[in-house]
């Protein structure tokens, strides 16, 4: 039986590819998709969800827009990475359907209530919507199987020296998620920076030759440009968000550890840092499964295999 999931995202090139991977995978039943502000403004990320589902001919999936800003802070966006639209590069279709007439939290709550079994929430943007759901609907916590997030890092950040972008945007929300008591799976930079797509991988996807694989290749063409900056030391572009979906599909591709994670919300230099108690120094019980390594070739092969679904 397919695993029911609820996808909360802020597309974003890698979010878009996570949507492509999820909807190409019969093991997953995508119940709804909600958008969060992050990689671009809330209006643009919502539009990008609708554009991607129009491309994939999945306008049957309910969509709702989420919070317009973080819980306690002004919004920061990553337009320097994802461009003016949030999905610069390919020519994507205009949406042919409208979002639901409700908020992201309302759609999430409805989805959880109506599901016969607990739902896995996959969150690939800032954690604002998920935190609002957890705070406003404590009675639904038991309907959440786990929360799989792309965010954080055990080591170095990518937005500040200490913080990864998604967590930095709304650290208070991320702290609510980690301390919720619900199982959390964290795909942080420690693993996503190893899940790099090289130029030859992009050409492999392009050669599959269907409209979706072509769009994915064009998304990667654009995404690679930002990551060519020599400061990163990358061979390709780290495909952060699809690691969440890939872990659900093939957990054997990933090495994980069970650790306690907290989020720094006050630090002068470390605001938004995910503090991972790697050596069990705090005495706190682990609250997260933290991904630390990935079989890069296996990850690329999975993407290539699933892109053939769209032939």
Swiss-Prot record:
PROSITE patterns in alphabetical order: IUNH (PS01247)
- UniProt keyword Metal-binding present: no
Tagged with keyword Cytoplasm: no
Its keywords, alphabetically, are: Glycosidase, Hydrolase
Top-rank taxon: Bacteria
Gene Ontology MF, one:
purine nucleosidase activity
For this record, the Gene Ontology CC terms, alphabetical, are: cytosol
Q: Which sites are catalytic?
A: 240
According to its UniProt record, this protein's enzyme class is: hydrolase
Could you tell me which InterPro entries the record lists for this protein?
A: I/U_nuclsd_hydro_CS (IPR015910), Inosine/uridine_hydrolase_dom (IPR001910), IUNH (IPR023186), Pyrim_hydro_RihA (IPR022975), Ribo_hydro-like (IPR036452)
Q: GO biological process annotations for this chain's record?
A: nucleobase-containing small molecule interconversion; purine nucleoside catabolic process; pyrimidine nucleobase metabolic process
- Its EC number(s): 3.2.-.-
Main role? Hydrolyzes with equal efficiency cytidine or uridine to ribose and cytosine or uracil, respectively.
Q: Which family does it belong to?
A: Belongs to the IUNH family. RihA subfamily.
Q: Which NCBIfam families match?
A: PRK10443.1
Q: Which HAMAP family match?
A: Pyrim_hydro_RihA (MF_01431)
PANTHER family per record: INOSINE-URIDINE PREFERRING NUCLEOSIDE HYDROLASE (PTHR12304), URIDINE NUCLEOSIDASE (PTHR12304:SF4)
Q: What is this protein called?
A: Pyrimidine-specific ribonucleoside hydrolase RihA
């Amino acid at each position: 039986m397919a695993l029911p999931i609820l996808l909360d995202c802020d597309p974003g090139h890698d979010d878009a590819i996570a949507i492509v991977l999820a909807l190409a995978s019969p093991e997953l039943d995508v119940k709804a998709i909600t958008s969060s502000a992050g990689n671009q403004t809330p209006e643009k990320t919502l539009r990008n969800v609708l554009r991607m589902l129009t491309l994939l001919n999945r306008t049957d999936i309910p969509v709702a827009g989420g919070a317009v800003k973080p819980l306690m802070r002004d919004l920061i966006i990553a337009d320097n990475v994802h461009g003016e639209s949030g999905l610069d590069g390919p020519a994507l279709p205009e949406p042919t359907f409208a979002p639901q007439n409700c908020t992201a939290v309302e759609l999430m709550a409805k989805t959880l209530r109506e599901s016969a079994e607990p739902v896995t929430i996959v969150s690939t943007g800032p954690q604002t919507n998920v935190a609002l759901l957890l705070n406003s609907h404590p009675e639904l916590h038991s309907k959440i199987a786990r929360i799989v997030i792309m965010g954080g890092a055990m080591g170095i950040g990518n937005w500040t020296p200490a913080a990864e972008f998604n967590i930095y945007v709304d650290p208070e929300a991320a702290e609510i998620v980690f301390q919720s008591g619900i199982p959390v799976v964290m795909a942080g930079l420690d693993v996503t920076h190893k899940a790099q797509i090289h130029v030859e991988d992009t050409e492999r996807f392009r050669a599959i030759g269907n409209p979706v694989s072509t769009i994915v290749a064009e998304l990667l063409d654009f995404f690679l440009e930002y990551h060519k900056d020599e400061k990163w030391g990358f061979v390709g572009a780290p495909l952060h968000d699809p690691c969440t979906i890939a872990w659900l599909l093939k957990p054997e591709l990933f090495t994980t550890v069970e650790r306690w994670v907290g989020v720094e919300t006050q630090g002068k230099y470390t605001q938004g840092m995910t503090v991972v108690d790697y050596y069990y120094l705090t005495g706190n019980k682990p609250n997260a499964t933290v991904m630390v390594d990935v079989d890069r070739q296996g990850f690329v092969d999975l993407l290539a295999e699933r892109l053939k679904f769209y032939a």
